């Protein structure tokens, strides 16, 4: 059939020109497992399911790593979670004793805490005439019935011996307490009989982690033990032709002097250390806030990654009531981390914890602190700082002191990187004029595109760089774009004024007695 198809028309569809968002969050947990776990030593488990309890079979239900997964999932079932599992070394398990003295002369209740006031607290019913042997046996039985507890227990006469499930030093931070009073029971002392010793070899643990993790939870906190994760992240901070940076979170329990000593050897913009005070009382031994350090680190990493996840509901973690801040996204990188609500953490008993002066000194030295609000009914995070204090020449440097500064800067860079990658994926380069309908770039077009990205970052959807005419003019005046057509290279230098956080208000109130 002779069909006339004039004029000939062909219309191709092309993708819309849209900005590229920053990549979704991904968090890595590293921790010790038990022999009941199904995974092998040093293996990477990817994309742990948010539903059910896969961590129990994978890592052992009462393992350190399974507890970290549970704590993370309490606050964040959305973000992708991976884990590296480590077998115990040929080490020593920590042992703590609770010594019961006396025979009850009336019924009552003792409360035993074994590693977590929230998750592993046991009310022990004591009957009238119960002997110390009977009470000790009841305590051991209750602890052993908790399949997730980080201790197993055995009772001999009136002494309960708690043995840490995982060998090594991490369990030395776990708190054990015997609370309450029962007539006739004259003693319930807590003491450490054997400290945990010898941790897994950590040197090459992260070799299997080839993806980018914006957060890594690392239970070991001594200077030598954090070195592997610091080295791993340091090489990724300014990677070539990629965005691979992240931040590691760990925690430790010690005296104030010991904490300052530990921090002296640290200086990394990729490491956050949460510091809690070691309390030593007749009936209690452990951190002021009785929760495992590794669980606290996992909790915060979960909240941080949720904050940075687009459209995630985060209202319950904020004290701010600003409407657009109630949902996660890149803009939350600049919202202060201090006063983050940590309702999953226990309170702190009167007389325990850091003083205001100690908190200030720890913060200045590079430690972050978790505590409670002024009424004591909710956990809160204090200033979240990195251990970075000085530059390579040992000069004081505040550039990456606060985690907010690190996250803000990182998200700014990633936005520029992703959008440069997309916009100039297949572009010509010229010192001349642009040609309509052709993919060509010159200095002016690259400059204009960079300026547009800055304006995006200053808008309500990002709030990462300063907005307004003065800030934008500063950016434009300090933006330098140079072309080298021979090698197709564009060199861009920019000064980016970031949004920071309101941390201190000072003022003077002068009293007046007359308005005339």
Which sequence ranges carry the predicted segments?
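Extended, beta-strand-rich, solvent-exposed assembly scaffolds of outer structural proteins
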Residues: 49-59, 99-175, 231-238
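Bacterial flagellar/type III secretion structural subunits and associated motility module proteins
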Residues: 102, 106-117, 179-200
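A glycine- and small-residue-enriched flexible loop/hinge signal that marks low-structured segments
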Residues: 141, 209-431
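Extended Gly/Ser/Thr-rich low-complexity repeat segments
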Residues: 169-185, 295, 300, 508-510
């Amino acid at each position: 059939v002779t069909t006339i198809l004039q004029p000939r028309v062909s219309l191709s569809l092309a993708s819309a020109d849209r900005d590229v968002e920053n990549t979704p969050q991904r968090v890595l947990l590293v921790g010790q497992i038990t022999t009941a776990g199904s995974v092998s030593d040093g293996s990477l488990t990817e994309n742990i399911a948010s539903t059910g309890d896969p961590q129990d079979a994978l890592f052992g239900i009462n393992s350190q790593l399974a507890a970290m997964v549970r704590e993370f999932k309490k606050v964040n079932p959305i973000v992708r979670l991976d884990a590296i599992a480590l077998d115990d070394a040929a080490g020593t398990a920590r042992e703590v004793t609770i010594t019961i003295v006396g025979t009850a002369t009336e019924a009552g209740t003792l409360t035993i805490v074994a590693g977590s006031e929230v998750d592993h607290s046991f009310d022990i019913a004591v009957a009238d005439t119960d002997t110390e042997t009977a009470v000790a046996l009841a305590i051991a039985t209750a602890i052993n019935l908790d399949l997730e507890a980080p201790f197993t227990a055995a009772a001999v006469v009136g002494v309960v011996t708690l043995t840490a499930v995982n060998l090594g030093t991490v369990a030395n931070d776990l708190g054990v307490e015997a609370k309450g009073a029962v007539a006739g029971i004259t003693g319930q002392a807590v003491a450490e009989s054997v400290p945990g010793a010898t941790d897994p070899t950590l040197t090459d643990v992260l070799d299997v982690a080839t993806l980018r993790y914006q957060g890594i939870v690392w239970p070991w906190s001594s200077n030598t033990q954090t070195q592997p994760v610091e080295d791993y992240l340091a090489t990724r901070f300014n990677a070539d032709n990629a965005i691979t940076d992240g931040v590691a979170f760990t925690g430790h329990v010690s005296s104030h002097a010991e904490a300052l000593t530990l921090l002296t050897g640290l200086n990394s913009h990729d490491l956050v250390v949460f510091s809690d005070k070691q309390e030593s009382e007749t009936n209690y031994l452990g951190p002021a806030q009785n929760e495992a350090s590794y669980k606290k680190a996992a909790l915060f990493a979960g909240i941080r990654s949720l904050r940075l996840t687009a459209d995630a509901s985060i209202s319950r973690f904020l004290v701010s009531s600003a409407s657009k801040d109630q949902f996660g996204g890149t803009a939350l990188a600049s919202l202060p981390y201090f006063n983050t609500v940590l309702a999953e953490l226990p309170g702190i008993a009167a007389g325990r914890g850091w003083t205001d002066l100690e908190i200030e000194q720890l913060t200045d030295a590079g430690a972050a602190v978790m505590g409670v609000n002024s009424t004591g009914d909710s956990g809160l995070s204090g200033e979240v700082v990195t251990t970075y204090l000085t530059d390579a020449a040992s000069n004081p440097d505040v550039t990456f002191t606060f985690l907010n500064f690190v996250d803000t800067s990182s998200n700014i860079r990633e936005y520029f990187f992703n959008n440069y990658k997309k916009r100039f994926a297949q572009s010509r380069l010229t010192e001349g004029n642009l040609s309509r309908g052709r993919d060509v770039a010159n200095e002016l077009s690259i400059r204009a595109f960079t300026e547009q990205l800055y304006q995006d970052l200053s808008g309500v959807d990002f709030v990462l760089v300063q907005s307004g005419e003065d800030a934008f003019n500063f950016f434009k005046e300090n933006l330098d774009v140079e072309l080298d057509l021979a090698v197709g290279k564009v060199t861009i230098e920019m000064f980016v004024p970031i949004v920071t956080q309101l941390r201190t208000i000072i003022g003077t109130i002068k009293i007046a007695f007359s308005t005339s």
